[in-house]
Structure formats: structure tokens, C-alpha cells
Regions:
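C-terminal segment of classical bacterial N-terminal signal peptides
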Residues: 15-24
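Short, well-ordered beta-strand elements
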Residues: 28-41, 59-64, 154-158, 283
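Short, polar/charged alpha-helical segment
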Residues: 41-59
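N-terminal segment of the mature folded domain
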Residues: 68-125
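Ligand-binding pocket segment of bilobal, Venus flytrap-like solute-binding proteins
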Residues: 73-74, 81-89, 158-239
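A conserved helix-loop-strand patch within extracytoplasmic ligand-binding domains
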Residues: 104-159
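A bilobed periplasmic-binding-protein/Venus flytrap-type ligand-binding module shared by bacterial periplasmic
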Residues: 117-128, 263-275, 298-299
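C-terminal lobe and pocket-closing loops
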Residues: 222-287
Length: 305
């Protein structure tokens, strides 16, 4: 915690957010509880919010351990914590909209980090060497550029470890784009460390890599991965929620589609907006450029911060 807090002090002082610090005026806002989620970017944001709310607005801010669904449920049912700085809302859009409509929660900031999201990525060097292969569909025609270590005649697509929800989506997209017919193998990295290791190994050796990842993360910042757009448009929530995101046996006919757009909000309770209106305005206006966030996450990893 001390290491993260130290980094947060640096971030609060140095990272450019959309709100000018010169405009901050102290205001009594009372007690504020902030969800500190169990991944790096959300933890950093929570610590920065705590520092700014305390030092800039005179709040008595406290960090509360959290995770996506438990935090949303607690805020919705108990009105606490007051702030969830980085809440990935795709999995519970309807309950969130219901809570907002019924006056319990407020989506204070619909874009606290720019350039984030899940999808399929390649190293930047691959695009420099192959500028014409700038969409997923074009890359899928060239499995020979990503040889699978156990069968060089096949291309390797690195998916998520078993047990992750994204593994289901990747497996169904693999079928939807007929990747097996095109000469691809879906490779399970075995673990989060295995996934990260496959990227670092490929980049360090100057080899090509193609697979799933997400941003903001230290891995994206450190290894310079680029998300590849799909030519296929998003085929709708029904296809995604009722097929792509489900186990294969529940998705008989997956349609080719781009990745579901990730939605991340800073969510606050309605009571916090009323009682700490000036501080709530800060939450609504602070934005982290994705490149800056990734660089901060790399700094945290490299310095064990």
C-alpha cells in the first residue's frame, strides 16, 4: 500500500488530468469512501483520488477494498462506498441503468481513461513491417506470419487462460471467423503470467505475436502493443451477450463481430453527489490519457511501486 500511495503522490502531482489544479478550491465535503479495486490502474486512480480529495477539497477520504461486482452491489444496495473510480460496466449495464434511473447511483464520468478496452493486439513492430495488415481480417489471412511453436504450419492466436470470461468470447470469435479453416490454432497460455510471458518473449526476440489483451495495463505500455480494428462491425448485443460471451454449447451460430466496446465509468452514489458536490465535480472532470496511464503502470511494475 505504501508503494502504491507513493506512486499516487507522484501521479497526483505530475499526471495531466482535464481539470486544472489551479481551479481547485478547498471545500468541506465530509467523509468519503473510495473503492480500491484489485487491479493496478484502478488502485492507482483510487489513491490519486484520495490524495486530491483530501488535500484539494478537505475531505476525510478512506480507501475500501473492492472488486467489480461486489462494489457495484454494495453501492447499489447499501450506498457505500461513495466512489468507484474505475468500474467496468459491460457485465451489468441494465442493473446500473436501473440504479441510476431510481436515483441511487450516478455515472459521474463516462470516460475516466482514454484509449482503453479489450481486443486483439499485435506488437507495433509488426505493423511497421507489415503496414498493409492493418485489420483483424487481413491478419487472419496470414497465419504463416505467426507460426505456432508446436506446429509451424499453423498460426498461433493467444487467447485467455482457462477460467477467464474472455476465453469464451475468443473461442466463439475463433469459430465465427472460421480461423481453424484459415490455419490458426487457439493457444491457451495457462495463466496470466503465461499470457504476459508469451508477449515479452516474442517482443524481446523480435518475433510476431497475435492475441487477446486489454488496456490500460503495464504490458501494453511496456511492450508497445497495438489494438487491431475489425472490419466487421459490432453485430449487436444479442449476438454478443447471448452467444459470443457464452460457452460454446450455448452459442451454436456465432456471428462475426468486432469486440464489444468496453465501457468504464467513474460511478458515485447519489448521496455523495448531493453532499460533496464540488468534490463530485472533480470526479466528473478528471481524465487520464491512456498513454500516460500505461506509462504510470510500467513505472509501478519496474519500480515495484
Amino acid at each position: 500500500m505504501k508503494r502504491v500511495t507513493g506512486t499516487a503522490f507522484m501521479c497526483a502531482a505530475a499526471v495531466t488530468v482535464s481539470l486544472s489544479m489551479a481551479d481547485i478550491a478547498k471545500a468541506e465535503c465530509g467523509d468519503v469512501t473510495i473503492a480500491e479495486m484489485n487491479w493496478a490502474s484502478a488502485s492507482l486512480m483510487a489513491n490519486v483520488d484520495k490524495i486530491i480529495l483530501q488535500e484539494g477539497y478537505g475531505c476525510n477520504a478512506e480507501l475500501i477494498p473492492g472488486d467489480t461486482m461486489p462494489t457495484f452491489t454494495s453501492m447499489n444496495e447499501k450506498g457505500a462506498p461513495d466512489v468507484a473510480p474505475e468500474l467496468w460496466v459491460n457485465a451489468f449495464k441494465e442493473p446500473l441503468q436501473k440504479a441510476i434511473g431510481e436515483g441511487r447511483l450516478v455515472s459521474a464520468n463516462a470516460g475516466p481513461i482514454t484509449g482503453l478496452g479489450e481486443g486483439w493486439w499485435v506488437p507495433s513492430k509488426f505493423l511497421e513491417d507489415n503496414p498493409e495488415l492493418n485489420t483483424v481480417e487481413k491478419i487472419l489471412e496470414r497465419p504463416d506470419l505467426f507460426p505456432y511453436s508446436e506446429n509451424k504450419s499453423k498460426g498461433a492466436f493467444m487467447t485467455c487462460p482457462s477460467g477467464w470470461a474472455c476465453q469464451l468470447a475468443n473461442a466463439n470469435l475463433y469459430r465465427a471467423f472460421e480461423m481453424e479453416k484459415k490455419g490458426w490454432v487457439l493457444v491457451d497460455p495457462g495463466s496470466s503470467a503465461g499470457l504476459d510471458g508469451s508477449i515479452s518473449k516474442a517482443v524481446d526476440r523480435g518475433e510476431n505475436w497475435f492475441g487477446y489483451y486489454w488496456s490500460p495495463t503495464a504490458v501494453i505500455g511496456k511492450y508497445g502493443l497495438k489494438m487491431i480494428p475489425f472490419e466487421a462491425s459490432f453485430a449487436g448485443n444479442d449476438n454478443w451477450n447471448n452467444c459470443i460471451a457464452l460457452p460454446e454449447q450455448d452459442c451454436a451460430n456465432p456471428k462475426a463481430t468486432s469486440w464489444n466496446e468496453s465501457e468504464v465509468n467513474s460511478v458515485i452514489t447519489a448521496d455523495f453527489k448531493k453532499s460533496g458536490s464540488v468534490a463530485a465535480e472533480f470526479i466528473a472532470n478528471r481524465v487520464y490519457p491512456g498513454k500516460v496511464m500505461n506509462e504510470m503502470l510500467v513505472f509501478m511494475v519496474d519500480n515495484q511501486a
